[in-house]
Amino acid sequence: MWRSLVIKLLSIVLVGCYNAADKPNFSTTIPEANTSIERLKEQYVGNRAMFIKDEVVVRGRITSSDAENNFYRTIIVDDQTAAIEVMVGLNTLSKSYPEGLLVALNLQGCYVGESYGVLQVGRKAESYSSYDVDYLDSREAVDIVIRRSQDVEPIHPIDLNICNINKSHLGRLLRISDLQLVYSTSIDTLAGETLHDACWRGYSLYKNSSGDSIAIYTRNYASFANHTIPLERLSLTGILQYGKYNGAKECYQLKMRYEEDCQPY
């Protein structure tokens, strides 16, 4: 696919691809990991931020992208054991931290929390905040945490059936197939709108042939938010989250990166 070609080209020109407002450090060598994201996740005790006082380094590849604005000021890093969301706090991250880039995360001095079931790292949130952690507050702070290599490779999602999803997959890039749209918060049924009028923004609910369901969440600011959802059976790719569907029942949700994360089944 064209995106794989773009990723290969990025691996060649990465050094010069950022703009003057966003100059991350990069290196041909980055620190080795001394633990895994899975192990870090096991150590985290939910419902409170955890301070990392010791030297903790994890390595992985970026699986998210803000290129189409469905992700905002964060990156997801996956080391093939688990995934973690870095609260970067900068814009247009896909230019400097593209999908498939190998990075090392120096987590000493950071706080670890959780949001929508996904492990997060950043600075400690204010006491009045409803979140565990907040965005890193400067370019310098970001450069301390994220060490960027020049190694970019295509990312391949994990193919799963809905019935096989569990909490170990939270934060990871999944592809779920045989999905049919059954509900969307984007339509007003009282006004006579139907699923033929549904667009991506908000929540949409899908079922497979076995009747298992999964939700898709799309930000209103995503570039494809107002594009019509295909009504054929689909394969959908995205980062797995867990939270309230349309403010009600909690369930697994996918958050797509690009509109092309939706493909015919």
Which residue stretches match the model-derived regions?
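Short helix-onset patch at the extreme N-terminus, typifying the N->h transition
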Residues: 7-8, 23
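C-terminal motif of bacterial Sec signal peptides marking the signal peptidase cleavage site
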Residues: 14-16
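Bacterial N-terminal signal peptides that target proteins for export
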Residues: 1-7
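OB-fold nucleic-acid-binding modules
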Residues: 18-104, 108-265
